[in-house]
Amino acid sequence: MAKLQAAGAQIYVCAKNAAGGLNWTFREPVAALLEEGKTVGRHFVGPTWEFVDGSRVEGEVVTKAPGKTAKDIPWLKLSVKESPKSGLVAGATSILRIDTKGGVFEGACDNEGELHSEPYAATYVFVK
């Protein structure tokens, strides 16, 4: 149906854990969605994909598989909560996140509330 490249960042926040210490916690993705080098939408918290044609989908994670390396975020299969009636991904029932590169961050977390942006890239496949 649609196979799009994503280029962006995984955003982490330095937050208290259950033991009272600080650690980096995933907050949200922020990415441009590209088709043949042209920006056709954006990906953000939800997870949500919004397109320049006005259509929008939200997904829910069904399954995960490890990325190719420890630095790569997992590959995902997501179900579409409600498929748009028109637009680039009209009729989509599921979304695959594959070919991930980067996005995993680990490091010292000293200032509660501090944000860190970790670059990532992925391919999103929207399936009918």
Stretches found by the model and what they are:
Residues 1-12, 18-128:
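Primary mode marks residue(s) on the alpha4-beta5-alpha5 output face of response regulator receiver
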